[in-house]
Structure formats: C-alpha cells, structure tokens
Amino acid sequence: MSSTPEAETMECGISSSKVHDSKTNTTYGIIHNSINGTDTTLFDTFPDSTDNAEVTGDVDDVKTESSPESQSEDLSPFGNDGNESPETVTDIDAVSAVRMQYNIVSSLPPGSEGYIYVCTKRGDNTKRKVIVKAVTGGKTLGSEIDILKKMSHRSIIRLVHAYRWKSTVCMVMPKYKCDLFTYIDIMGPLPLNQIITIERGLLGALAYIHEKGIIHRDVKTENIFLDKPENVVLGDFGAACKLDEHTDKPKCYGWSGTLETNSPELLALDPYCTKTDIWSAGLVLFEMSVKNITFFGKQVNGSGSQLRSIIRCLQVHPLEFPQNNSTNLCKHFKQYAIQLRHPYAIPQIIRKSGMTMDLEYAIAKMLTFDQEFRPSAQDILMLPLFTKEPADALYTITAAHM
C-alpha cells in the first residue's frame, strides 16, 4: 500500500457518502474479498414488519414434475462444494425459482449476489410478507445460510427457509419496516433512549456471534433492520467469516465489507479480529447520535485516503498507533498522526457534537484506533451508557412516517 497522499485531500464532512460499487450498480459499496472470492450482499429497505416465522433446519430441494431438467440438486447441505461453476442469473431464472414456493409482491434493487424480492408464501392465508434473496450456484449464499442456521438471538435476523431450484438458491428472511439508515434519515438524530435501545441490541448481537467465532465484517446502518427501537436485528451476513480455530487472535481474513465503515486495521490489510466489528458499531452509534455528520468527506478514493481521513478527523495521536511498528498502519500511516490532543482523549469531532458524557465516552472507546485496546462488545455493554435504564417512551414506526 502506497503512503503517498492522493491528489485530492479528504476533509471531515457533514454529508454521508457510501462507496459506489461499479460492479453491482448499487448505491452502497461493497469491497470484494480478494483472498477467498467472497462478495458481500446488500439488503434494501424493508417497509413492513413480520411476526415470528418457523425456521427450518435444512435447505430444501424443490422438484417439479415437468422434466428432469426442472428438478433441483442437492446442496449438501447448504451450498455447492466449490467445484460447480455458477450459472449466470437472469431475472427470469430468479423469478422462476422464487415462484416455486412464493408469490412475488415486488422486487427490490438487486445486490451483488442476485435478486431480492418481497414475497408472500403460497397457501399462507395470513399474507405475511418475507424477503427472498435468489442467487445462482449458492457458493457464497451457502456460507451465509450455514452461519444463520446456527444463530438463535433476538437481535440477529432469522433464516426462515432456504431452498434450491435448479442452480438457484433462495434464502427467505423476515421483512422489517425499514433499515436503520432509513430510520435515521427520517427521524434522526435519534432521542437518547432510542439510541441506547438500538445500540444495546446491536452489541448483544455482536457479543453473541463473536462468542460463536464469527466476524460480521459489514456492520452499518444499512444492515440493521427494525420495526421499532426495541425490535432491531443485525442482518446481511454475506461478508461474515469464521475465526480460525475459534480464537480471537488477529489474523488476515481478507478484505471485505464497506470501505466507509471498515476499521483501520482492515483498511490497512493488517491482521484483525472481532474488534473490527466494534469499530463499525461505534460509527453506527455516532450516526444515530448526529444523523448525517460523518468522519468522512464527500468522496472516498481508496483505503489509503480513507485511513488518512480517519486519522485527520479523529486527530489520532502517534501513541495511539499499534505498538508493533511492522504493521501496515505504522509503516504507511503513522506519518500522518496528529499531536493536537493527549493520547486517548476524546476527539473534538465527538466532543463538540453536544452528546452526553456517557455517550461520547462509549463512542470514543469503540473508535479506539489500535484494536488491541478497543473493548469487546461485552465490555461496551458494561459501560454506564448501557447499564442505566433508558426512558420508557419508545417510538414506533408508523406508515405516516415512511
């Protein structure tokens, strides 16, 4: 990674700009994993809620009576073994697969892996809406299904059903009223009681998956879904990876997630661990508190530019860099450190935002530049911000606000 500054200087800004992914033509960007070929998936806004649905344990094979070509293939049990070359998905292929079991109500903008639909289950008189994601081959989706099948937490999106028809895998999940990005855009900055409730749910989800040896790697407001603040879930596990040997020692797991919300160590291609999710969750906490104000400028030209923007806007002190000078962060970016505040003091961009002391302290701890000193999700949940009970009044999303 080059340490030469880009021609254009990034400035701290008040407008949020997600990185554009030209490969998928979606609004919010994805960084593709160059090591294992895994792509992340973007969900879209879910404008309605769904009640609890039964979770099936396996991926079903859907067979038809028309011809042998229409019969499904075994997923063994969640995805192909990597030897099959995924076919190219067309909208017709995806629609045909979805309609084997669901009625399509509407379609959402496609993500990097395939197509996303709002559906109702055939024969379900309740007309409960769900989200069906359809992708050919099932290689990447199979990993996401495998992870979600083992999750059971109130703040993690549930896998309702998964099945395969021909070469298309369909993954069914509950449909929520909106994502957190949309909720903040409509309501934000949020009241403190809502901020605490939502972030507590997110941290609970992260503590749960980290205990199970999973790193999410793409925690952001667009991947958090809710009906109301006390009913929030973390979704989109398309970028998630499993820890090697179930240890949280930093390792090189590849570059994945969203450039704007990645941790410094991930941006620098240094070894990382579950603490990378804590950094991203800290940005979520900040975004809920201040709405559109971010640490980043109006354009992001790459990981180097992003890191320099973080260092500048957070006024990262040289002593806050990793003690290991062989890391990419030290070798290429320590030269941009700023001695405008004491080491580990709360950055001015947080302090001047008018937050409560408990809130700004929690954000500052989560945005600790060196992952070695960044607290875990369980540690954050023990801070005064989350151990104090918030006010009882909680806002419920209604159609009038959507």
Curated annotation (Swiss-Prot):
Pfam families: Pkinase
Active site, per annotation: 218
UniProt PTM: Phosphorylated by UL13 homolog; this phosphorylation regulates subsequent phosphorylation of UL31 and UL34 homologs by US3. Autophosphorylated.
Span of domain Protein kinase: 102-386
Subcellular location: Host cytoplasm; Host nucleus
Gene3D superfamilies to which the protein is assigned, alphabetical: Phosphorylase Kinase, domain 1 (3.30.200.20), Transferase(Phosphotransferase) domain 1 (1.10.510.10)
Family per similarity comment: Belongs to the protein kinase superfamily. Ser/Thr protein kinase family.
Annotated protein name in UniProt: Serine/threonine-protein kinase US3 homolog
Organism listed in the record: Gallid herpesvirus 2 (strain GA)
